């Protein structure tokens, strides 16, 4: 049902540089890296750019989930040879293993798990959940229909053009197009839209009955590559209402939007 990554060894992800204090503070938390890749086919491994990079921190006692987006253009040490590049190059070059190692090394974390999805998986999940309600600004509306057309073409999932700015009920493809928008502002604003779509979708999932949750799992899980097994997921899926999304933020907070190199 779920594409479990057999090449990903969790014990390799132990961060040797983490302080004892930090390790103590992280007890009782489950930290998972979420990668959204912009594949134009169904592939999710290396060779794809990670468009979405979110660190998901779950407090296993309280059920609070914190989401922190890493801006994909953040310059970090992306490999163990001190090579600095835009962070999404880590996933492109070395897949989830290199990306998780880079997050741990640069951000002083100990992430042992990850899940990677492509846009079709997100669109399918939101369609099963019945869509989400979003207020579109005029600038967002100006660009969204081009993204809808492109996302329909790359996923093969049907949708239609939106008619106006303001309150809109978005289907899966339209919600993905909204999360992908960036031409009229920055990656900072884009990651806020991504987290908004995750929050709205998660709220729908929490309210859904078990047959809907089961349908999401059956349709979406085969499209996800992950170090997490079904045994990890099923207890949480049966007890979804105890989880809630708390703080969400973008990293780094220092918002110097400097263009690097010719491509920017």
What residue spans do the PLM features occupy?
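Non-catalytic, solvent-exposed segments at the cell envelope interface
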Residues: 1-264
């Amino acid at each position: 049902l779920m594409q479990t990554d057999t090449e990903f060894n969790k014990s390799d992800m132990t961060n040797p540089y983490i302080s004892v204090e930090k390790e103590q503070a992280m007890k009782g938390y489950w930290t998972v890296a979420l990668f959204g890749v912009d594949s134009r086919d169904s592939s999710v491994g290396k060779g794809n750019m990670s468009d979405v990079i979110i660190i998901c921190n779950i407090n296993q006692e309280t059920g609070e989930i914190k989401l922190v987006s890493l801006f994909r253009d953040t310059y970090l040490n992306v490999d163990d040879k001190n090579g600095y590049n835009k962070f999404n190059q880590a996933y492109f070059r070395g897949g989830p293993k290199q990306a998780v190692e880079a997050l741990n090394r640069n951000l002083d974390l100990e992430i042992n798990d990850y899940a990677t999805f492509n846009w079709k998986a997100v669109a399918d999940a939101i369609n099963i959940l019945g869509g989400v309600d979003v207020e579109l600004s005029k600038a967002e509306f100006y660009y969204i229909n081009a993204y809808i057309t492109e996302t329909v073409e790359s996923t093969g999932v049907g949708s239609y053009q939106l008619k106006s700015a303001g309150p809109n009920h978005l289907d899966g493809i339209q919600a993905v197009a909204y999360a992908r928008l960036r031409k009229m502002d920055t990656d900072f604003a884009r990651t806020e839209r991504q987290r908004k779509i995750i929050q709205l979708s998660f709220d729908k999932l929490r309210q859904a009955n078990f047959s809907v949750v089961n349908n999401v799992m059956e349709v979406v899980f085969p499209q996800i590559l992950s170090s997490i097994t079904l045994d990890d997921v099923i207890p949480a899926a049966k007890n979804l209402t105890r989880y809630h999304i708390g703080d969400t933020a973008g990293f780094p907070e220092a918002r110097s939007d400097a263009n690097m190199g010719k491509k920017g």
